[in-house]
Amino acid sequence: MSSLQPVRGTHDLIGETQLRHAHVVETARRIAGLYGFDEWATPIFEDTRVFARSLGDTSDVVSKEMYSFEDRGGESLTLRPEGTAGVCRALVTNGLTQSLPQKVFYAGPMFRYERPQKGRYRQFHQIGAELIGAAEPLADAEAIAMGRDVLKALGIADETILDLNTLGDTESRAAWRTALIGYFTECRDQLSDDSRARLERNPLRILDSKAPQDRALVADAPRIGAFLTPEAVAFWDGLRSALDLMGVPFRENPGIVRGLDYYGHTAFEFVTERLGAQGTVLAGGRYDGLVAEMGGPRTPAIGWAGGIERLSMLLDATPAAPRPVAVVPMGEGAMGAAILLLQALRAGGVRAEIAYRGNTKKRLERANRIGATHAVLIGEDEVARGVAQVKALDDGSQAELALDAVTPYLAGLAG
């Protein structure tokens, strides 16, 4: 019988892969804290309606890519394909629509039934940020600046470009929608089957189509800029001015669009050329209508999400694994003292390990194999004198220290 393998489109996070993954999450978490964001953790699966409302019944994600199932109680549940919907649902469920703004950071796995390829998995991981309850363009600029600061902290900001667009306000989009219907109706026969169906229900969804024949038509479709109201222009100007003031470079790209009605004003993507077709590493926009879709009041919001796998691939080097200290008892008579020292080191914040078997030589070999910085050797003679031998494994230097001085000494080196 062949050994079991990970399900297609999934992967194990082990060794260097996990080190890179953890570094992205920890870096983003630190930057989020500097911006005053609190971390939330929402369920990995939700009522299917949560995502049908957030993504739209006609979207590819809902119609083709969601992992949905009926539980034993007959409820339709879905593994989350993205993080924003769950955050907005949690905001309403927990009665936080009266305590705004809320700044939310999250990280975790998402699930979509897509064709696996480089940088794209069926179980993938995201970091994300949602700033809920602020309608001003400065909020959008702050969210974007935070995303760029995450990329800077990861050392990859210079390899990405911020593409920025406006989707206007409700009045702007209504006029734009009418123009799009007229345009796509004239070339209806050239549209894909999916887009012909969307033309009847939500023509903005055609703008998100990945079908080659649709992409060619979308390229020549009317653009929102011709339909912006004075209020939408003012918001757009305010956002660009704030980004300039914050020192966040961007390029205007009218091709950055969102197909759902509750999206408006800001849409953006940080893209790179290093990952080929999967070049978007962090993207977001303003979604003032989504909280209302979850049963709450109409609430302004701006957010983004970044793919951890893609961000990990851009890191120049794998972060160094933490190195432990190895406690090495020299003889069974010293084992009790070695265990006490082991626990004292851990209590003092020092990563420490002990080999469960073997003579002194074997234990030292294992200490080198696990990359220990120091070996703390303690035998019956050391126990009797209340000392230990602390050996630096990188250069072989050795010092004798009192037992109660070992932990402060090694903690100081680690700090």
Curated annotation (Swiss-Prot):
Entry similarity comment: Belongs to the class-II aminoacyl-tRNA synthetase family.
| Presence of the UniProt keyword Transmembrane in the record | no
Q: Which Pfam families match?
A: HGTP_anticodon (PF03129), tRNA-synt_His (PF13393)
Recorded superkingdom: Bacteria
Protein name (database record)? Histidine--tRNA ligase
Q: Name where it's found.
A: Cytoplasm
Keywords assigned? Aminoacyl-tRNA synthetase, ATP-binding, Cytoplasm, Ligase, Nucleotide-binding, Protein biosynthesis
The UniProt subunit note reads as follows: Homodimer.
Q: Which PANTHER family match?
A: HISTIDINE--TRNA LIGASE, MITOCHONDRIAL-RELATED, HISTIDYL-TRNA SYNTHETASE
Q: Tell me the GO molecular function terms.
A: ATP binding; histidine-tRNA ligase activity
Query: What catalytic reaction does the record list?
Result: tRNA(His) + L-histidine + ATP = L-histidyl-tRNA(His) + AMP + diphosphate + H(+)
